[in-house]
Regions:
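Cysteine-centered motifs
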Residues: 6-7
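Activation on beta-sandwich/Ig-like modules and their edge loops
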Residues: 27-153
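Short, compositionally stereotyped local motifs that mark structural "simplifiers"
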Residues: 30, 85-89, 95, 136-317
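Middle-to-C-terminal accessory/interaction subdomains
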Residues: 130, 159, 255-281, 285-294, ...
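Residue-level detector of buried hydrophobic side-chain packing
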Residues: 31, 53, 90, 118-120, ...
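Short, conserved helix/loop micro-motifs enriched in His/Cys and acidic residues
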Residues: 330-337, 344-381, 459-477
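Bacterial N-terminal signal peptides
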Residues: 11-21
Length: 628
């Protein structure tokens, strides 16, 4: 309908009463249109597309909105109060969901896409109007047609009369004769919908519309594909999209992720998010390339467990993830984000065996192994698994190897991982995501004010850490026990892309908890490059080669404390005699390789890699385990 960036609400200049009322002044004010899944119809001043509610003064007298309330609960003790202004006869006004403290025309609650009931009350608390809003598809609305009937609208009209084509509802959703998952070549899939409807299908990933192929006969499966279908009928809006990935003669024993979307959103030569595009700098890392964009595109995300049972099926937002090395690989890392506007604001499934308590995620990452891509394909996740499976006091990321398909095309082996952010910390530690402080590298803020860690690191670097009083003060603010495990593992790994890089740390809030490090991106470890010796002196690397960087200097200062120095060296020795011993480390490597080795030839072939390179890196990693 339009974009209204200049103001977060609309007013313009005929609704039949939905609930008969005695007071004619009240009776003329009505909820005339509602959108519970706004993707593109209306934009607020900060670039968001929130839910919205339209009111209409259908009478001949002005209505003073002062004291009126809007709520989605029948007995709401704290309903939202409309602004103190008047609505002229025939005038419409649109209110948007949002933080009501930020603007008087933003109501402080969200609308349920699966259905909602709205209550409009006058200053005395009497019910003026109630509207039961059914489940709505994206960018559809529900409201009052010119004849007074309640109808669905495929083209909403916020701030104006609902004069676009009105519909009775949605066509029934098509039903497939076969569930998503494994299928043999030659299998037929039948599709049915309600009588009098026409079914349209697609097999290239895009959501079908009325221009898509008309279904007239069973779909025969010859190869892995994503089958999607909608139904249309007279007087009805198109149905919801039915979607199923059929994994035809798929040999892998790993879980499978299927992503599907309109091919152009990812692969259009000029516009596709996955592509280099027309504006890329020709020099590495190709700033300006499409894959550097922060843009999100909607994709259908299906997750199949190792038994080919579909455990997740929802639409999420996708963007390219990662830093310079990762984004410039031909297999790019992907970030998946659940959004309420797509029907669910969380992804719910226990993806990570070593973190069984984690069953809800705001974001997931499909990682390509970064600098270890088409090399060892194991380095980073190996150390996270060592930490998790051996109880190290480090904040690490869950890991699950998955085979990925995009629009039915094999996309290779990827790592399903958690995304480090405030939601990740909330789900792992039970902290308030709005209060948590997260910094990275040289005290650059991700969330919260950096002054607090700045003061801590300055104190550490300017005070004698062997003084018990000084050390106790630091111990009250910094989780030293966790720091010891974190530095011990990073230094054993021989990580040369650290401490000046790949470093994040957090605390629950300004007034509570201690700072802790978050471990991630250990790709440049275990002799990845020829110039990194297996017997790398990690103390020299941290204290001399990385001298001057904040976290190297924190470590140097703490080593000045007799107790810390003893605890650190003892802990490092304990780890090297247990999980980091030749036997313990080799056992974990073998366990992880057992999961993924069978997939490597197909993965390397897909990305034009040399499987011989992978074999060389496995030998290097085994040598590292033996002599490090």
């Amino acid at each position: 309908v339009g974009n209204f960036p200049c103001c977060p609400f609309l007013r313009t200049g005929i609704v039949i009463s939905l609930v008969p009322l005695l007071n004619p002044l009240h009776a003329q004010l009505r909820i005339s249109e509602v959108c519970t899944s706004n993707h593109t119809v209306l934009e607020n001043t900060v670039g968001d597309h929130p839910d919205w509610v339209e009111l209409h003064n259908a009478g001949t007298d002005p209505v003073d909105l002062t004291g009126y309330t809007l709520s989605n609960y029948h007995s709401d003790p704290a309903p939202w109060h409309l602004p103190q202004e008047s609505l002229a006869p025939g005038e419409f006004i649109v209110f948007m969901a949002g933080n009501s403290d930020q603007h008087p025309h933003w109501f402080g609650f969200d609308l349920g896409r699966s259905g909602e009931t709205l209550f409009l009350r006058d200053p005395s608390g009497a019910l003026v109007n109630m509207l039961e809003v059914p489940a709505l598809h994206p960018d559809n609305s529900f409201g009052v047609a010119p004849d007074g009937a309640l109808r669905y609208f495929g083209t909403p009209t916020p701030g104006a009369a609902n004069t676009t084509e009105a519909y009775l509802g949605y066509a029934p959703t098509p039903v497939f004769s076969r569930s998503a998952g494994s299928a043999a070549a030659g299998t037929e899939v039948h599709i049915t919908a309600g009588s009098g409807t026409t079914i349209h299908i697609s097999t290239n990933g895009r959501d079908p519309d009325t221009s898509s192929t008309v279904y007239g006969w069973p779909v025969t499966l010859h190869h892995t594909l994503v089958l999607k279908a909608i139904a249309v009928g007279p007087g009805l809006l198109p149905s919801a999209v039915s979607s199923a990935t059929y994994l035809v003669n798929e040999p892998t024993t790993l879980p499978i992720v299927s992503l599907s979307t309109h091919p152009d959103t990812l692969f259009h030569p000029e516009l596709g998010l996955y592509m280099v595009g027309p504006n890329a700098d020709p020099n590495y890392p190709h700033w300006g390339a499409n894959f550097w964009s922060e843009r999100h595109v909607p994709v259908r995300f299906e997750y199949f467990d190792e038994h080919r049972v579909r455990r997740v099926d929802q639409v999420v937002d996708l963007k390219i993830h990662g830093g310079r090395v990762s984004r410039n690989q031909p297999q790019r890392p992907l970030r998946l984000t659940a959004r309420k506007r797509h029907g669910a604001d969380l992804i719910e499934y226990p993806f990570f065996p070593e973190k069984p308590w984690l069953q809800r995620f705001k974001r997931l990452v499909l990682r390509n192994s970064g600098a270890d891509f088409l090399n060892g394909q194991i380095r980073d996740q190996l150390f996270h698994q060592v930490a998790l499976r051996n109880g190290l006091d480090i904040d690490v990321l869950g890991y699950r190897p998955v085979v990925v398909f995009i629009n039915g095309e094999y996309w290779g082996l990827m790592e399903m991982r958690e995304r480090i952010d405030e939601d990740h910390l909330a789900f792992n530690h039970g902290v308030d995501p709005d209060s948590v402080l997260i910094m990275e590298e040289e005290n650059f803020p991700i969330q919260g004010d950096s002054i607090h860690f700045h003061e801590l690191q300055h104190y550490i670097r300017t005070h004698d850490m062997d003084d018990p009083v000084h050390y106790a003060h630091v111990d009250s603010l910094l989780d030293i026990h966790s720091l010891i495990d974190y530095f011990a593992l990073e230094m054993f790994a021989g990580n040369v892309d650290w401490t000046s890089n790949n470093l994040k740390y957090w605390k629950p809030s300004l007034g509570t908890g201690k700072w802790r490090y978050l471990m991630y991106d250990l790709d440049a470890t275990m002799h990845l490059y020829d110039w990194i010796p297996i017997d790398l002196d990690a103390f020299y690397w941290v204290l001399v080669h990385r001298a001057g960087f904040i976290h190297s200097e924190i470590f140097r200062s703490l080593l000045g404390n007799t107790r810390f120095r003893r605890d650190f060296l003892n802990r490092l020795a304990d780890l090297m005699n247990t999980c980091l011993s030749e036997e313990g480390f080799a056992h974990e490597i073998a366990r992880m390789r057992q999961l993924t080795d069978a997939e490597m030839p197909r993965h390397f072939s897909r990305w034009w890699g040399d499987i011989g390179t992978w074999e060389q890196h496995q030998a290097i990693i085994a040598e590292f385990a033996a002599i490090r």
